[in-house]
Amino acid sequence: MAASTMSIRSSAYSDSWQVDDCPESCCEPPCCATSCCAPAPCLTLVCTPVSRVSSPCCQVTCEPSPCQSGCTSSCTPSCCQQSSCQPAYCTSSPCQQACCVPVCCKPVCCVPVCCGASSCCQQSSYQPACCASSSCQPACCVPVCCKPVCCAPTCSEDSYSCCQQSSCQPACCTSSPCQQSYCVPVCCKPVCCKPICCVPVCSGASSLCCQQSGCQPACCTTSCCRPSSSVSLLCRPVCRPACCVPVSSCCAPTSSRQPSYCRQASCVSLLCRPVCSRPACYSFSSGQKSSC
């Protein structure tokens, strides 16, 4: 129906056609029930709730019209009740933003079972993309529940069990629907990104820490052995355990001003043997060569 209607106003002084400024009617069938519409002083039918407490007009969506204020202020729309909220529930529902308070339009998945507790990261039916695909706005849906399960390791950082194999993908944090500002990086360390070789279980010249693992070279910051040989199918360490001994512990100088006389291992040998069969040392007291 048009926003304004033509009406004839009889007058002893004028019988001309005039256009009045009556607002758009909401009494069309798709809008309000007929029982909630009442004739206005002008010839345009304006949707006016019969009762401001309970009226059929408040149960049906009203297009922008004067009756909208009566709907929103006098009753709770039915779209705000508990239901199996679909992701596009609010956008596809007959309720308009003015008629349906955004707090009522929060889908079920936007309200996590817990709030910030450790149990929030446990296995649940909560989908990772719930907040992203939800019709709730970010201010309406607190993304605490958006933290993936793998973002919370089951062990302490210095624990050896933390380095065991897990199902956590390396791109867990980056592929999470949570934004960087919502997901604390400390909690987003994938368990699988800290392989066994990153926590050596050996000391000194032991080669146990040099075993093969899924650890990327950039993952290990400290290791007692050098990277494995790229030409060996058995993937043995490039160096033997003797090469793994730090130079400082090979020959301890008697004076802090004198350098260590341990020679570097051969860089052309795949077995990485020392240049001499045993690291050469000099006795600072006698000045004679000896063996370590």
Swiss-Prot record:
GO terms for cellular component: cytosol; keratin filament. It comes from the Eukaryota. Sequence repeats lie at residues 26-30, 31-35, 36-40, 57-61, 79-83, 99-103, 104-108, 109-113, 114-118, 120-124, 130-134, 140-144, 145-149, 150-154, 162-166, 172-176, 182-186, 187-191, 192-196, 197-201, 209-213, 219-223, 224-228, 243-247, 250-254. Residues 26-254 are annotated as: 25 X 5 AA repeats of C-C-X(3). Restricted to a narrow region of the hair fiber cuticle, lying approximately 20 cell layers above the apex of the dermal papilla of the hair root; not detected in any other tissues. Keywords: Keratin, Repeat. InterPro entries: KAP (IPR002494). The keyword Transmembrane does not apply. It holds the Pfam family Keratin_B2_2. PANTHER family: KERATIN ASSOCIATED PROTEIN, KERATIN-ASSOCIATED PROTEIN 10-9. Interacts with hair keratins. In the hair cortex, hair keratin intermediate filaments are embedded in an interfilamentous matrix, consisting of hair keratin-associated proteins (KRTAP), which are essential for the formation of a rigid and resistant hair shaft through their extensive disulfide bond cross-linking with abundant cysteine residues of hair keratins. The matrix proteins include the high-sulfur and high-glycine-tyrosine keratins. Belongs to the KRTAP type 10 family. This is Keratin-associated protein 10-9. It comes from Homo sapiens.
